């Protein structure tokens, strides 16, 4: 997927991409809170893997979201330029769902990472994911130009906070420990639902999601360029005021 970047951002990212020496890497994307790199080192093989540390912890404003997103894109550009099929790639962090979805949207056709998720015991564990495409049965959608898709894999979203459009749900809660099987279920639902939208006059899908990073990332990989435009909403200051327009690669209000 082509990144939408300003020219000076792309030039800076291009220069950084030329200094890669290690083919194996860990991509940490975190803007909710910082991830302690020491807490994941025992899971990373080989141990000398390159660390791509895209971390900030200020999320109280549209400015902070946009600032992190610029940093996010610079790392994604470097990954796109350097990743190969035989590379080992880890993904972890505490990002806004919009950012992990964007990561999956951009990198999904490149290679799936090993996900590092934080367990209920406050220790990280590794999740291997191999895509198994299977058509998922989804309900029929109304012939509306704009709809809502709500993916609730952790907590329930207040429906009164949603935009007033026909709304469709994925409500299967994630297991305590994320598995490849569950990630495939989420992927196949998302892709099948958006594929079905193509048969109607739907032009825009408002996506609201509660999920761990691995789930959000896989949702992003399921979204294709031929699908209706997807806007991923961010819950901040008790409202869904801001969203990431995936097609434009831009945070909007």
Where are these regions (language model features)?
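Long, low-complexity, Lys/Arg-enriched
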Residues: 1-208, 213-253
């Amino acid at each position: 997927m082509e990144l939408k970047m300003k020219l000076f951002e792309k030039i800076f990212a291009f220069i950084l991409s030329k200094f890669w020496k290690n083919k194996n890497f860990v991509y940490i994307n975190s803007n909710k809170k910082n991830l302690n790199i020491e807490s994941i080192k025992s899971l990373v093989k080989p141990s000398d893997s390159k660390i791509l540390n895209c971390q900030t912890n200020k999320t109280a404003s549209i400015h902070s979201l946009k600032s992190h997103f610029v940093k996010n894109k610079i790392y994604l550009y470097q990954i796109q330029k350097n990743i190969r099929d035989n590379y080992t790639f880890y993904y972890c962090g505490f990002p806004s769902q919009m950012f992990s979805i964007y990561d999956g949207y951009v990198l999904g056709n490149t290679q799936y990472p090993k996900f590092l998720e934080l367990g209920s015991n406050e220790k990280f564990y590794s999740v291997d994911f191999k895509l198994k495409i299977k058509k998922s049965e989804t309900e029929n959608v109304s012939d509306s130009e704009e709809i809502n898709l709500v993916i609730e894999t952790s907590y329930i979203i207040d429906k009164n906070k949603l935009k007033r459009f026909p709304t469709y749900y994925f409500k299967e809660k994630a297991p305590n420990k994320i598995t490849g099987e569950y990630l495939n279920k989420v992927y196949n639902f998302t892709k099948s639902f958006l594929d079905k939208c193509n048969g109607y006059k739907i032009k825009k899908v408002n996506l609201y999601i509660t999920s761990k990073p691995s789930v959000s990332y896989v949702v992003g990989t399921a979204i294709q360029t031929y699908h209706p435009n997807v806007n991923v909403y961010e819950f901040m200051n008790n409202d869904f005021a801001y969203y990431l327009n995936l097609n434009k690669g831009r945070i909007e209000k």
